[in-house]
Amino acid sequence: MVQACEGRSRAQLPTLSLGADMTQPPPAKAPAKKHVRLQERRGSSVALMLDVRSLGTVEPICSVNTPREVTLHFLRTAGHPLTRWTLQHQPPSPKQLEEEFLKIPSNFVNPEDLDIPGHASKDRYKTILPNPQSRVCLGRAHSQEDSDYINANYIRGYDGKEKVYIATQGPMPNTVADFWEMVWQEDVSLIVMLTQLREGKEKCVHYWPTEEEAYGPFQIRIQGMKEHPEYTVRHLTIQHQQECRSVKHILFSAWPDHQTPESAGPLLRLVAEVETPETAANSGPIVVHCSAGIGRTGCFIATRIGCQQLKARGEVDILGIVCQLRLDRGGMIQTAEQYQFLHHTLALYAAQLPPETDP
């Protein structure tokens, strides 16, 4: 190979035309090379012996981590605890928070890895898919011949408790019955909705009745409604066959898509609305959704977990919270602006807590 390349290089050099009265001197002879044995070149008199039979049997010096392994390692180990005092008086700068946020792997699902026929027709956004290891599988309470698929994931809560939340997309016309089946199957007593039905374009269909309506085999009734400045609370009943259950539905409308609320107060009041004895007594997960089920949904869940950490420990690990959320559902917390707003909201909550007592 080397000789062939050298041959091409010489062939490409321009030739020099010599005059008739000039004679070309004979080429100088290159000095003879002294052949050196391999042992001498290596500076050793010990013969080099290579047993080709041993090739391939030696363990590699180090293993190479795949991008997937690197992602999982980061999401499982990263953290940045902040005390109440630091969060209020010496918080990271917006630039530092942006840099920290951009280092967090999104952990989105590759569509090729989701081997579920026909799932695309039930996805509001083709690139936002449920992570397989934590996705909710429908048990098919009705006789409809369909898959167990719904674009939803179980999400861990404070202290890593399993299945505290279900994060899901805003229901579509062809997934409303699936949504209510999930509510029934998981014994859900609280739904938090963080989007309006339309924000320029459709973000979510009107999946609850004005008074009473059937969605598949589930009969939904409105029992009462109360409007607050930033959100509306509806008390529903869901009936399947002869069994009837109560469900609380909260529609928080003061949050534009891909942005943040004008102030943190309304979000903290929403969290307080959720912190009721009824919520604590119910064993089922809280269903949280916006349009895609990752941005505003992630912010609400992270805020509630962060408030619980501050109240119980006197510090909060917002980076660790977001990493835990993204392990369960890729892309939770969509923008650096939302990440910064999360810090601002939790700093406000920390300021509202009773003064810390000296140990």
Swiss-Prot record:
Belongs to the protein-tyrosine phosphatase family. Non-receptor class subfamily. The keyword Cytoplasm applies. This is Tyrosine-protein phosphatase non-receptor type 7. It comes from Rattus norvegicus (Rat). It is found in: Cytoplasm; Cytoplasm, Cytoskeleton. May play a role in the regulation of T and B-lymphocyte development and signal transduction. It comes from the Eukaryota. Oxidized at active site cysteine. Treatment with pervanadate (vanadate and H(2)O(2)) or with antigen enhanced oxidation of active site cysteine. Residues 38-51 are annotated as: Interaction with MAP kinases. It catalyses: O-phospho-L-tyrosyl-[protein] + H2O = L-tyrosyl-[protein] + phosphate. Residues 1-34 are annotated as: Disordered. The modification Phosphoserine is found at residues 44, 93, 143. Its main location: cytoplasm. The modification Phosphothreonine is found at residue 66. The active site is at 290 (phosphocysteine intermediate).
